[in-house]
Amino acid sequence: LADLAAADLVLWLPADDGRFIAAAHCRPATSTTVHVDDIIGLHLPAAREIDLRRALHSGEVVRSPAARWAGTYSMMETCVPVCHEGRIIAVVTREANLSSPRLSLGFEGWTVAAADTLCQMMARGEYPYDSTPQVTSHGVPRVLDGALLLDAEGRVQHATPNAVSCLRRLGIRTHVTGKVLAQEITEVIGDGTLIEESMAVVVMGRASWRVEIAARASTVSMRALPLVNGRKRLGAVILTRDVSEVHRHEQELMTKD
């Protein structure tokens, strides 16, 4: 979420003394961090508590009306209530450094819109997901590794250059924008390839699972981030990562053993 939003995420818990204390912090890999120093365990300045209390009591996402000057940079802050089992238990601040240019990764702003949707889902208790993929030795795909945006029907709306490169490794040479990702992948896999049962669910963006797809001596790991509003499917973000070299290294070690 931090990478999609190109912003720091700070989890604030209401303390017994009525103030907020920082319990967790995640820096973005797609922009410059707002907090250079470690802030875990620190209290929120009283001047910033108004928006957090609004989010905590209203259960709605609260955006600052204007940028705030923070020393040597300006910052735009969004307060996102964290809903769990129908109760607001914390607030996440999404803090974007406006003085630093975002990394040019071919995103064209759609990742920020996807982050907005995930924040709305967090306020409704729909994100983080109930089930998340386990971290393997290959790691979990990140936004920097490659990202695609699918609509509710599984059609590709946007793709970062790294995601396009991952698809090319699998043998998908044509432009995928406007096409159903699942169909494009099925065509290049081949009949003799073992297909994981979860593949269709992931590449259609219907569950927050992870799957590895192998074709043409290449292996690409994919993870789905479904975008929903209640029972309505809005689409999904698919994160991709080329793990071919890792697989080849593992095969070499097995051969030596």
Model regions and ranges:
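PAS-family sensory domains
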Residues: P14-A15, R19-A47, G106-A115, Y127-P128, ...
